[in-house]
From Swiss-Prot:
The record marks 284-285, 741-742 as: Cleavage. It comes from Bean yellow mosaic virus. This is P3N-PIPO polyprotein. PROSITE patterns: HC_PRO_CPD, PV_P1_PRO. It comes from the Viruses. One of its GO terms (cellular component) is host cell plasmodesma. The keyword Lyase does not apply. Residues 619-741 form the Peptidase C6 domain. Its EC number is 3.4.21.-, 3.4.22.45.
Amino acid sequence: MTTINIGTIPVVINQNADTQMGEGTKNIFPIVKDFVDPFADLEMRCAERVKRMGELCFSKKGRYITMIPKPDYIKAREKEQREEELNFQNSEHVLNSLDTTCTPEHHSSRNNGMQVSFKTQHYKRTFRKPRIQAKKRDLKGQHTIHYVAKELLSIVKKRDMVLEVVDKRKHANFATFRRYGKTYGMHITLNHMVRKRRRVDVTLNKLMTEIAMHCAIPFECLNTLTLRKGHSGLVLQTETVPNVHKIKSKITIVRGVVNEGNIPVLIDARKKLSGRDMSTIREFSAGDLFWKGYNQTFIDNRPTDLNHQCTSDLNVTQCGSVMALLTLALFPCGRITCKKCVENFLNQNNKERFNNASVFINQVIQLLEKGFSEFKHSKEILLMFKERLQMENPATDQCMEIAKATAALPEAPFSHIKEINNVLLKYGSLSNEEVGGASKHLLEVVRYIRNRTDSIQRNDLSKFRNKISSKTHINLDLMCDNQLDKNANFVWGQRAYHAKRFLSNYFNEINPSEGYDKFIFRKLPNGARELAIGRLIMPTNFEAFREQMKGKMIDNGPIGKDCVSRMRGSFCYPCCCTTDDVGTAVISDFKMPTKYHLVLGGNDLAKYIKLPTDTTGNMYIAKDGFCHINIFFAMLVNVSEEKSKDFTKMVRDQIMPKLGEWPTMMDVATACWQLTVWFPDTLSAELPRILVDHKLGIMHVLDSYGSISAGYHVLKANIVSQLIKFASDDLESELKYYRVGGDCNFGSRVRIDTKFLLKSIYRPDLLERIIEHEPFVLVLAMQSPAVLLALFNSASLEKAVQYWMHREMQVSHIMTLLAVLASNVSASKLLTTQFEIIEASAPQILAEMDKVHLPMHSIHSANVFLMNMSESRETDKTIDELGFYSFKKSSRILMEKNLNGGFGGAMARIRIVGTVVFNKAVVASASKIFKLCNPTRRARYKRQVHNLTQVIRGSDKTTVTCSEGSGCPFCRKED
């Protein structure tokens, strides 16, 4: 056995020593009987590592590279593809021949036709040309300069720009390019082209000469046999120009021709001319032709009726510059001789012309102000031209709306309005005749309006029109998805719970099982209105149903003075009855009843909102005299759920007690106005339809039960913001005094609250409820100094201040004012002085009450009381100044006794209870003392208790002799 080392790995080789060796060289090494791979062990140990490695590839640079290993699923997919391809190649299913005798089997009787090619005999397939990308070469040295010059010239040619070439000596040459066929000809600016006469017309610098040689064109490119005006400065190749003057240069710059022996010879602009040639040369500048036409036309057409002798005052060069600016401002073009520019200008309207020229005109005006201050007239011309160009009607949409509104109205004044509207649409391109015609039509419109205004001032209502709007009022609160359920019904949410304050106080329940007979007639102060609630029971017969759906007409007469409202002489249309197109009053018809709904709007635009329902399934109808509660119910729809509690409490506790039954429309509008201050969202709340009964002076707020009585006028007010106009004192209207509901007896509420206050003075539980829920009841204590002092002495006012200090500072401030007032009253002993102190403080407390905005019932009572006291004081002040005595002052003692009646009874009961408790305590304590003390001390203790008893009972005696009938606990015989 032989052991050899391969690297660091030992390998054992077994040798057979008995094997015979041959004579050749092939037997020189020992023959291994059993071959063993020396790397097997190494491969086995490195197998896992090699498995994680990729394939070993041979790179082009002679190195081995290990590739990224492939995932197993890719190796499996490649293996499947190789096997599939190998199977396909080894498959024997190969088509060797085609049997032409076989007839194909027809599976369908339908003729499938045959394939026809559109190729002709001249068809030749076009092979796709390979796209060869040109390699960009890096420009270096002189190539860069040539490339930049070439690109620069290309830009100048395409954009029709002026090329300026300057050498080191700052000698500049100018050139332009003009198109001749497919090539561009270079025109160098010569002296004679700018009105300068020189022997040498141009001197080129070195760079300009090289550019001119590069841009020179042959004479044949001009497509003409002779040169003509406009060819001055053109650079031509000398070898292609006939009859050119002696010149050694390869280029010729056209200046003009000189006759030499009756032969015209072309003169190069760089050649120096003699005096004779200067006088005879015919140059090819187009400016001569321009100035020839300009001068002749100017002289022939200049005005002759001038009031002065013209002189040459302005600089001629500046005149030319200003003329060029005016020309470009009036007619933007590249060349004044270009027909394409003329055509483009004619195809533009005024708006397009203004957009194209406005920026340049502004620049020209600024340039004239800075560099040409003497040419003020040119600036005025441009401003006038600019104003003329920008004349356009910016409100064409409104004109189209006018046309739509008057399309079906051929009579005056709408026919005149149509003509005026047509003229306004054409503003910017009007003739004088059209403007004059529009003025005549406007005169007719003014005459019509003047006659109509005069008729209104004469109370002539023949021209009065107050149509119902054809557009439905959009209530965003009824369109918001968050306010609707899946059936698009309004979701009341918390509003449904708080709406019970309305339903429980101002609505009657209707049990459908008992019928509707007792709810058919709604009582009025001086009549009745028949509701359609009984028609909820419908017959199935069509004829009977149609007969049942007829209303009972009531004659309310035509449009009259009581149907309209005026404010500062003009009609206030929302507060008027509605009319049709011809001025006839719109009258109500039969209104269908519905169940469980709140109806907003009227006629065909009514919206039905499902009312909040309960488990009983009963319906609700407003009580007689309280139909105006439906207005506040409609306003509740626009109140947010968070504020619905405050809204319903304010309506129940403050608004409805003021209104009561059958208030006037002015009071209802005032109440709505107050609510909109605290709840601004209700301004856009939609109202139920309001009908006007002129015979009875009543306004009916329709509910969901409809109306059989028909023929009423219809009020136009549709939303709360329109209804509150009835609350204005400036409104001249009989409608605002019509009854809708109301109770003018405000004093009853004050008396009830006052009795409740007197009852609670010495009852801590009631007084605590007043302080926490209705603190403004304490303000009513100002009616009596005794009541006010009782609250002050019992520390009730102090408790009210402490309770509201961290809840509502304004309420706490009012309670503080009451406490200060009570302390001032306690300092006075005379009743009249106490009343004067109280009355003097009423305006201050009333001003503070106006700053409180809380949904409390007692606010109204306190405000009414304070306003009465303040106004009464102002009235009495005038009487006192005149030397008279008010009867109210003499009756104050009687009023004080009247208020102290219940208050004094409570105090008497308290004294009796106190006496009984005191006597029991004294007797219990004395019985113990008498057992322990001697007779002398007993007598002394007896006298002290007797004196204390007299003081507590209010006696003025400081020492009283004990007797048996004195009432003293000890004035009795000792046992």
